[in-house]
C-alpha cells in the first residue's frame, strides 16, 4: 500500500512538473517599459510632445490640407415635423500657414425638398492673411516647444533608467552584503563560544556587532526594493552588466556642447530677436485681408473681391505698452537662460567626470586593500594549518577579505552608475 502511494505521489509530481507553465524572469526592457507606463510625469511629457509636434506641423507641413464642413444660421439644415425642408452644407478645403496666409476652396452643396433639387452653389477660392504676420517667429517658437517637450520626455526616460539601474545594483550589492554577513555572523558566534582569551573575545564581540549592523543595514535596504526588481534580480543584473558597454560607448574626451534644452532656447532666442525688430507692432492695427474669386454658375461669370476686417483698441490700459516692452526685453532674458543652460551642461559633465576620477582612485586603493587582505588571509590559513595561530585569527582574516571584496563590488557599481549618468549627456542609454 505504501509503495502504491509513493508511486502515485511521484506520478502526480511528474504531471505537475510537465503541465505547470514556467514563468520566465522579466528583463530590463520589460521592467523599464512597465515603469515608464506607470509614470505620470513620463506620460504627461509624451502627451505634451504630441501636442507640440502637432502645433509645429501646422508650419512645417502647411501642404497638408484640412477638410471641414459647415453651415451658417441662414443656411442651416432644417428638419421639422414635415421632415427635411432645406439647407446648405459647405465643404471647405484649406491650406493653412502658406507664407502666413490661409488658402480656402469652398463649394456649397444645396438641398431643397420643395423643389426636390440637390446641387452645388457658387464655388469660391479665397486667400486670407493678417496685414502683419510673424510666421518665421511663430514657427521658431513652435520648434522650440517641440525641443522642450522632447527634453522633458528624455529627462523622464533618463531618470527612470538611472533609478532602475541604481535599484538593481543596490539590490545585488545589499543581497551579497546580507548573505556574506549572515554567514560571517554564524562563524563568529561559533568561534566566540569556543574562545577563552579575553582580548580575543572582545575583538570577536566587536566583529559580531559589526556583522549585525551590516545585516540590519542590508535588510532595511532590501525592504525598499520593489517587487519588479526583487523577483527578477538575477536577470536584471545580467542585463545591466551586459549592456553597460553599449550604454557607455558614446563617452569620449570631447564634452557635449549642446542639448535639447539648449536647442529650444536657441530657437526661442532667434524668435525673440525677430519680434524685437518689430516691437512697434502692438501699437499698429492689424486687419485681416481677404482676396477672393468666385464663379457664378447661373451667369457663368468670374467675380473677385477684397475685404478687410479690423478690431483695434485705440485706448487701452497699458496692454500694448507691456507687449512692446516684452518684445524689447525677452531677447536678453532668453540669452541669459541660454548662457546658464550651456554652463549647467558643462558643469554637469565636469562634475560627473570628477566623480569618476575619484571613484577610479578609490577602486585602485581598494584593489591594493583587497590584495593585502588576500595575502593576510593566505598567511593566516598557512599559520592556522600549522597550529601557530588560533581559529579566531584565521576566521577574522577570512572575513576581512570577504568584506573588502564586497566593498570593491560597491565601488564598481558606483562607477557604472556614474558612467550611465554621463552617457545620458551624450545621448546614450535607454
Predicted feature residues:
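Periplasmic alpha-helical coiled-coil/stalk elements that build and connect Gram-negative outer-membrane
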Residues: 1-9, 26, 30, 135, ...
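Residues that define the transmembrane beta-barrel architecture of outer-membrane proteins
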Residues: 83-89, 117-123, 300-306
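Bacterial Sec-pathway N-terminal export signals of envelope proteins
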Residues: 23-90, 143, 197-201, 205, ...
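A glycine-/polar-enriched beta->alpha junction
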Residues: 36-41, 53-66, 91-119, 124-141, ...
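Transmembrane beta-strands of outer-membrane beta-barrel pores
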Residues: 73-77, 109-113, 131, 293-299, ...
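Bacterial N-terminal signal peptides
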Residues: 9-18
Amino acid at each position: 500500500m505504501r509503495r502504491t502511494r509513493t508511486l502515485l505521489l511521484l506520478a502526480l509530481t511528474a504531471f505537475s512538473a510537465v503541465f505547470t507553465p514556467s514563468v520566465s524572469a522579466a528583463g530590463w526592457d520589460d521592467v523599464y517599459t512597465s515603469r515608464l507606463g506607470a509614470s505620470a510625469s513620463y506620460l504627461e511629457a509624451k502627451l505634451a510632445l504630441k501636442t507640440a509636434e502637432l502645433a509645429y506641423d501646422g508650419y512645417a507641413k502647411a501642404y497638408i490640407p484640412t477638410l471641414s464642413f459647415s453651415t451658417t444660421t441662414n443656411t442651416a439644415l432644417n428638419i421639422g415635423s414635415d421632415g427635411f425642408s432645406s439647407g446648405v452644407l459647405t465643404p471647405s478645403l484649406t491650406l493653412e500657414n502658406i507664407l502666413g496666409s490661409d488658402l480656402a476652396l469652398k463649394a456649397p452643396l444645396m438641398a431643397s425638398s420643395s423643389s426636390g433639387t440637390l446641387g452645388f452653389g457658387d464655388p469660391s477660392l479665397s486667400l486670407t492673411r493678417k496685414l502683419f504676420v510673424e510666421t518665421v517667429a511663430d514657427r521658431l517658437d513652435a520648434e522650440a516647444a517641440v525641443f522642450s517637450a522632447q527634453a522633458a520626455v528624455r529627462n523622464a526616460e533618463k531618470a527612470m533608467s538611472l533609478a532602475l539601474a541604481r535599484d538593481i545594483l543596490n539590490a545585488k550589492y545589499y543581497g551579497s552584503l546580507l548573505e556574506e554577513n549572515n554567514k560571517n555572523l554564524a562563524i563568529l558566534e561559533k568561534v566566540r563560544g569556543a574562545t577563552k582569551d579575553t582580548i580575543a573575545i572582545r575583538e570577536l564581540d566587536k566583529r559580531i556587532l559589526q556583522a549585525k549592523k551590516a545585516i540590519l543595514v542590508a535588510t532595511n535596504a532590501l525592504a525598499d526594493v520593489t517587487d519588479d526588481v526583487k523577483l527578477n534580480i538575477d536577470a536584471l543584473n545580467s542585463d545591466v552588466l551586459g549592456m553597460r558597454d553599449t550604454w557607455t560607448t558614446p563617452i569620449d574626451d570631447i564634452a557635449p556642447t549642446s542639448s535639447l534644452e539648449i536647442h529650444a532656447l536657441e530657437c526661442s532666442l532667434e524668435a525673440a530677436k525677430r519680434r524685437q525688430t518689430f516691437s512697434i507692432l502692438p501699437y499698429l492695427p492689424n486687419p485681416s485681408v481677404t482676396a477672393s474669386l468666385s464663379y457664378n454658375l447661373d451667369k457663368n461669370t468670374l467675380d473677385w473681391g477684397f475685404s478687410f476686417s479690423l478690431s483695434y483698441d485705440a485706448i487701452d490700459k497699458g496692454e500694448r505698452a507691456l507687449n512692446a516692452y516684452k518684445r524689447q526685453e525677452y531677447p536678453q532674458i532668453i540669452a541669459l537662460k541660454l548662457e546658464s543652460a550651456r554652463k549647467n551642461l558643462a558643469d554637469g559633465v565636469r562634475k560627473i567626470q570628477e566623480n569618476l576620477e575619484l571613484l577610479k582612485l578609490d577602486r585602485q586603493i581598494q584593489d591594493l586593500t583587497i590584495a593585502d587582505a588576500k595575502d593576510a588571509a593566505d598567511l593566516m590559513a598557512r599559520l592556522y594549518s600549522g597550529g601557530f595561530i588560533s581559529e579566531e585569527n584565521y576566521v577574522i582574516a577570512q572575513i576581512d577579505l570577504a568584506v573588502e571584496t564586497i566593498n570593491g563590488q560597491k565601488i564598481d557599481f558606483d562607477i557604472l552608475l556614474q558612467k550611465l549618468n554621463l552617457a545620458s549627456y551624450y545621448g546614450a542609454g535607454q
